[in-house]
Structures are given as C-alpha cells and as structure tokens.
Design a protein with these regions (language model features):
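Hinge/lid segment of periplasmic solute-binding proteins
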Residues: 101-159, 168, 191, 210-216, ...
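Long, aromatic- and glycine/proline-rich binding clefts that accommodate carbohydrate-like moieties
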Residues: 319-329, 375-432, 436, 461-466
Length: 466
C-alpha cells in the first residue's frame, strides 16, 4: 500500500538521519528508544515527599505501559491558583493536578478538573477505581455533588502526638497534681490541653524531668504560617467549640464572629502563649522538627506530617517516646472534633491524554500501587481499607497502622469543608484576622468583626445573601 506523502517524507528523513548517525558512530536506537512510543503526562503539584514518591512509583509502573510522568513542582499554596488561572486561560499543559480537599469546590466549579466518575463508564473502569475500598471518613472531602473529584492519595487526619516519657515521669506527675489538683494525663478536653501546655512550657535553666534545660521547652507545638497552615490547625478547635466553618450552609450567612467563633478564637490566642516563638512562619514540617528536637510536649498536626519526622531516627531525638491520640473534646456532642483532610490526584480538564491519565492514576493508587508508594514514603496515611488492613502494612508500617486504628476506632465527630467555590478566599480572610489577633495587633472581637464584614461583602458580591 502506498504511504501518504507526509509519511513517505518522514520515512525518507528517517533513512537520512540513520545514515548520518551511523557515520558519526551513533546508534539511532540508543538515542530514541527511551522516548519512542512513550506518553508523557505532566503533573502540577507541590514538592512534598509523598508526591515525589508518587512520581517515582508512577514512572516505575508506567514504564511497561508506555507512560511516564513529568512533574512541575510549585509551592503548595501556589498550585491552586496556577490550576485555576491555566484552566481559565485554556492552557493545555497539564494532565494531573494535585488537589487538597478545600480546593475541590473552587476547581470543580471552574471546570478545571474532571470528576473520576466520568471515567467509570464500564465495569472494568469502576473496578480499577475500587470505590468501595475507600475509607469514607477520609475520602469524603474529595467528593462533591455525588462525584469523586480526585483519586484519593493521602489522608491527613489531625491528631495529637505526645511525649509518653513526660506524661509518665513521677516528678512531673507529682508537680502537676500539686498545681492543678488532678492527675497528669493525656488531655481529653481543651481545658486540660491548656493546663498541660502551660505546665510543660519551661525556660532554659529550668528543670524538666529533673534535668536542667539548655533550651526553652514548649507545651504545645503548632504551625501557624498564613496560606492555609494556620487555619487548618485552628479549624478543629473552631468546630470543637460548636461553630460553623465560616458560614452556615443552610442560610449562607457568615458566622465568623458568632459567640462560638469568638470563644474558639480566644482559646487559640491564649494557647498561642505556650507555642514555640515564630510559629507564624512555620509549616507542618517545620513545627514537627521542633517536636523532633525534643523541645515540645504535644504536637497537633496532620498525622502524616508527624509520622514523616517523629519516628525517623536521622531526624528525631524522640524516637520511641511518641504516641498518637485523638484531638481533645470541648462539647460532648462533638467528641474529638475533626475536620476531614484529604489529598488526591485530579485529572486536569484540558488534558490531551484522558485515557492514559486515568489508566496510570488507577494503577498507581490501587492497593498494590499504594503499598509501593508507602515503601518510598513510609509516613503515607492510606485511604483504602485494603491497604490499612494489609498484613504487610500492619507489620512494616506499625506507626501508621496503630495511629489510624486509634483514629478510626475512636469515631471522632468529623465535618468536611462545605461546597463553596470561594472557600479559599473566605478562609484567607479568616486567617488574616486570626494572625492579627495572635500577634496582638487587634483584639479577638475586633479582628473577627472585621473578618465577618469582609466575608459578608464577599457573599453579597457572589449573590449568596442580600
């Protein structure tokens, strides 16, 4: 059969190229076989260790499929805006986009990402996703309007990590009992957390467990950097105090300065006195390094942040001295209140490789693929029941299994970010107010009243309220 003209020109060019390569002693096969027939998928995401691990495993699994992943890493808080701007501008560069659960409303409303359900058009495709295997307490944040918007990758339940040696020390137990009138124990309420944080906050030169400290010691360690880190720690206390997350979904009325919101903010500002100085500049990883250095009694953070540092011998001085527990309780009706936190892999709406993107995503984030990612990033908190209960995971990743068992068996009161496409904007307003209150620039009331007015204005512009 006669080749089309363009193909013949390419064939002729190929012969000439081969002859030239032979003349200079090069093999055309050695120069092109790696790229030949490979589909390259581009990934827009943060350079977090778990996503570096994902890319590595994706390229291992994808190689025999003829698929490779090329990452483009940005700072975490820039990924959301980049995905929004590029999708609105018609940029077709991306195939995958990292998604944090609070971004789902905005990205889905902007049609920047595709629901995974769009690909589940056959029994085989549905089987590849394994939706019934997901732990809904962890994955619900990636769902909206009955659709799953990203392949679940990493659960990030917020928990406490605490120094078991401190709480068991007889000197500290005796001193705590004398000062507060009840036994020293892991805090079950936020009042107890405040007491414990105050008690363990010490200056260099004071004693801890009978030994003189050469550095300051902090009762509680938290990351309070703006850009989401502060709000994602504070929101659990906000919910614990009975408040809505920024607004009432039933009425769409902002509730930033509600009595419950004011009480929660006052508590957090008071707790801030017992945190490490400079917490306003710290992300989760930075805060955990303070805890790992042996200078904190309790950390409150996403479980994977803590697991990626505290049990790691080359990073931590407290290996073998840490245990994990649910967050405290403020209201009996909201035990161990927790805001669902999830990270996933979304398929970019303008991808030019829909089928390949779906095929590789499901291969990497199925049961076996997730276990491979855990080998590269042992702190990964999986979102599949089949992985959590896998005998190999129980044995080789005992800290992950034990902590997640505590979380799931404890059945914390869990809420998820409401479906508001302007969520990130509203969150930033609230976070700025909290920063002002924590720094002493404004009173809690003034800061939250100002934030309330700004969120009301935002909601009016969007037509949610009059």
């Amino acid at each position: 059969m006669l080749q089309p003209r363009s193909d013949r020109h390419r064939a002729a060019a190929g012969v000439v190229t081969a002859l030239l390569l032979l003349l200079v002693g090069l093999s055309p096969l050695s120069q092109s076989s790696h790229a030949q027939g490979m589909t390259t998928l581009t990934f827009l995401g943060p350079d977090f260790d778990e996503w570096v691990a994902f890319v590595k495993v994706a390229n291992q699994i994808g190689k025999p499929m003829g698929i490779q992943v090329k990452p483009d890493y940005l700072p975490w808080d820039d990924v959301f805006q980049k995905a929004l701007i590029d999708s609105k501008s018609g940029v077709r560069t991306w195939d995958y986009v990292y998604v944090y659960n609070t971004w789902v409303p905005g990205l889905s409303a902007a049609k920047a990402i595709l629901p995974i359900n769009d690909f589940m058009t056959s029994p085989a495709a549905t089987s590849a996703v394994q939706p019934n295997d997901f732990i809904t307490l962890t994955t619900a944040g990636l769902e909206l309007n009955g659709k799953l918007w990203a392949m679940p990758m990493l659960a990030a339940p917020y928990m406490m990590a605490y120094r078991t040696d401190l709480f068991a020390n007889p000197i500290e137990k005796k001193a705590f009992q004398a000062k507060y009138g009840y036994p020293l124990a892991l805090p079950q309420t936020y009042k107890q957390l405040m007491d414990v944080a105050q008690f363990f906050t010490r200056k260099a030169g004071e004693k801890l467990m009978g030994k003189t400290l050469d550095q300051d010691f902090y009762g509680v360690v938290l990351a309070n950097k703006s850009g989401g880190f502060l709000f994602h720690r504070y929101e659990h206390i906000l919910v614990a105090y009975g408040a809505n997350l920024i607004y009432d979904p039933k009425t769409m009325q902002p509730t930033v300065n509600s009595p419950q919101g004011i009480a929660a903010a006052k508590y957090y500002v008071a707790l801030h006195k017992y945190m490490e100085p400079g917490s306003e500049s710290l992300t989760g990883g930075g805060a955990e390094r303070i805890m790992a250095s042996g200078r904190g009694a309790i950390a409150m953070d996403a479980l994977d942040n803590m697991l990626s540092v505290l049990p790691v011998a080359k990073l931590s001085k407290v290996v073998g001295k840490i245990n994990y527990a649910l967050l405290p309780t403020q209201l009996a009706s909201r035990p161990h209140a927790n805001v669902g936190d999830a990270n996933g892999l979304a398929i970019y709406a303008l991808t030019q490789h829909r089928d390949a993107a779906f095929k590789l995503a499901t291969a990497v984030l199925n049961t076996q693929g997730t276990k491979q990612v855990m080998k590269e990033y042992p702190a990964l908190v999986p979102m599949r029941a089949s992985v959590i209960h896998d005998p190999e995971v129980r044995t080789n990743y005992a800290p992950v299994f034990n902590a997640m068992s505590t979380f799931l068996n404890g059945k914390p009161y869990t809420v998820f970010i409401p479906p508001l496409k302007e969520w990130v904007q509203a969150q930033d307003i609230y976070e700025q107010a909290m920063s002002a209150a924590m720094s002493g620039q404004q009173s809690v009331e003034d800061a939250l009243n100002g934030a309330q007015a700004k969120v009301v204005a935002l909601f009016k512009r969007q037509g949610y309220i009059k």
